[in-house]
Amino acid sequence: MNKKAPVFLHDYSVMAVPIRGALGAAALPTLLFFLCQSATAWADDYFDPAALEFANPQQKMADLHYFAKSGGQQPGTYPVTIWVNNQQVAEGPIVFVDDRGVLQPELTSAKLAEYGVNVSAFSTLTRLHDGETFTRIEQFIPDASSRFDFATQRLNLSIPQAAMNVQSRGYVDPARWDDGIPAAFVNYNLTGSQTRQSETQSRSSYLNLRNGANLGPWRLRNISSMQYDQHYRWHSQSTWLQRDVKSVKSLLRIGDTFTSGEVFDSVQFRGVQLMSDDEMLPDSQRGFAPVIRGMAHSNAKVTVSQHGYVIYETFVSPGAFAINDLYPTAQSGDLEVQVKESDGSVRSFTQPYSTVPFMLREGRSKFSLSAGRYHSSQHQVRSPQFVQGTLFYGLPAEFTLYGGTQLAQDYQAWALGIGRGFGELGSLGSDVTWANTATPSDRHYAGHSLRVQYQKDFASTGTSFSLASYRYSSGSYYGFSEANALESQSERLDNKRQREEISVAQSFGAVSSLAISAYSQTYWHSNSNDETVHLGFYSAWKGVSWGVGYYYTQSSDREKADRSWSFNLNIPLGGWLDESSVGYSTTSDNNGHSSQQVSLYGAVPGRGDLDYSLQQGHANAGQGSNSSAALDYHGGYGSAQLGYRHDSASNQLTWGASGSVVAHPHGVTLGQPVGDSFAIVRAPGAADVAIEDGTNVHTDGRGYAVVPTLTVYRKNTITLDTESMSNDTDVDLQGQTVIPGGGAVVLANYQTHIGNRVLFTLRNRDGAVPFGASVQLRQQEDDTGVAPQGMVADGGQAYLSGIPQEGVLEVSWLQNNIARQCSLHFHIADQQQQNTVKTVAGLCS
């Protein structure tokens, strides 16, 4: 024992635990005693390896000088998490070298820049060559330091704040945005039905496909659909190529797309577009899709269209319904909702949808540039070439100035607006658009439109209030879409005159809320108008929820307005049906129709991936009783639905399926429907491993999985559930952080060790293999993975994971400054296959 100081050991860990693998090591009674001690030291913490006592007095010891000082460990590559000033910034393998008895990380200026260090401010760093490594960070950045916590595999870097880049909260360096791997995918959503009415039978189906292919920063996308109703109709709605332009925080699109809908009404066109992408900003505002609420009087089919294209189709039961999973294809453009009842009657209404320009901070700007040929789903509509540009700029005193122009051969429009935040009073914006229109018959129209927008959230009262009003001051104002529909002098277009929207949401505590929304659209040259009103109150108490609603719909193509009321009640059950509820609902309308429904729905007991619903109801006006039953499976490879509906007018069988098929460099993987950016988990050989925070997502038989949604330009952590791993599976890192670029398919690659967990007892001619010797599995020539490795403990014992049924274990150590080595050919007996940890003893020669 060194006489300069008393024995003091701390921060030692995994002396006999493999560098990679799971589970603990062999027992080290004497060593563990020292590891748990703490005493005052009068000099550097130091431990003399010669002080170790072994159960076998004849036990020899390898050179353990790496462990002589507190925190000492063997040099090598370790999978670690990197923390800068107590914030995690990265994770991955780092090479550690022995520097005066302490493990120090090998760093580069590029790595420090990735961690947020202002590298350009230090000449000592800028003089380094690309890839040149260094270990002592304090020699390059004054007052900086590094500390490796071996027990938690955490590298802590302390860097003065003045040496860090000053960035907004949530900022992620664009250099870390991952363009992803080459991939191609198909996102599918299929619904269908077979209906029998009296003597007739009909079938219908709808297939929506969202296809994509990625190569580098480029993304190819396509949206197609197929409808069958007596005959097939296939339609490719849009195809485009896109990539992000990091230098200007923008998105470039080439092909079929939509113009920005913040200043002018959004229109579809084929051409080129460059527009600011706020998702690249630290405090970005995310887009939204409206919730569509309506009423069905029977088992009905609901179809949602935008710009003339069907974007959503589903089947609903009698009563009030809400659609909240839309994927709109444009930034604005009212949604046309069609409800087809079981008796064949059809009702339609308009759901307003537009993005409201939000206020910009002082000095910030955003823009949109579009050029191409206008495209419409309607026939006999002109398709002129045009250009459009819009610009927003944040001024002092919470003002935002914005404007834009649309230019075509027979149409010119200019817009100018200003918005301002008024603190507690909310935000108000107003703009004026002037337009000149020429028709093919050489008629000319000039008009203007005034728009006012207001939005306010009253946090103290839980009220959210927004209002948007469009006023067309003359009958000679035409929007771009309306102007292109003016085909001849004899045709008179009922262009829009005045439009109002209002939406108010009021919460009462944490369990009740009131929602009010209204929309009105009037037209020139017509007495008809479109109006929609919805009032709803919803509440809950001890798990019991209820709500009442009022719906009013007036369409310009219908003479009579529809008025309806609804009430619903849901009561959760207990016992073996603790994941189920009983529901009751009733509806009535101004046409004398009324209905009542009783339902039982929830998760099938013992099956978290399978939901069911049973309904029984009765309606007047000759419709009689109705009933339905449905199953909804939502698994790791997609979802499937099957339902049966019956009423006095028809019997209907419905079905559906949704999911994704992804082709990537490592094969083909099935998954749930994917978003624009998603991840491929690669854990070779680790079958049926669950992904944390992923609903029913798990790896397939090859160890691959699709994580269906990621937040672009943000840190996303993908974590494997180690509790779901089999006994022969280990991973180096349980979680990984990915930062996908827009539309990227990123790879979360896990280093797996598939094989046995083995406790070896190693002997040589002199007895047990020395304590502290290194052990490593000899790999085959075609094996490119990391070989399992570890260290010998007391009694020649070494624990390793990922070990094959047979192989060669290589052992090396330093004794009296002489390098020594031996190898053990081993075979695990078949009778040990049921053991979680196998044991192998043998002579190392």
Per-region residue spans from a language model:
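Short, ordered, surface-exposed loop/turn motifs in non-cytosolic proteins
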Residues: 74-96, 685-695, 766-782
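A short, amphipathic beta-strand motif
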Residues: 82, 292-294, 679-683, 756-764
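Short, acidic Ser/Thr/Gly-rich low-complexity loop/linker segments typical of extracellular
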Residues: 93-94, 695-704, 782-795
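Short Pro-Gly-centered beta-turn/loop motif in secreted/extracellular proteins
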Residues: 99-107, 326-332, 704-730, 793-810, ...
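Feature captures outer-membrane beta-barrel proteins of Gram-negative bacteria and organelles
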Residues: 177, 203-216, 235-248, 383-397, ...
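Membrane-embedded beta-strand positions of outer-membrane beta-barrel proteins
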Residues: 186-190, 222, 252-254, 367-371, ...
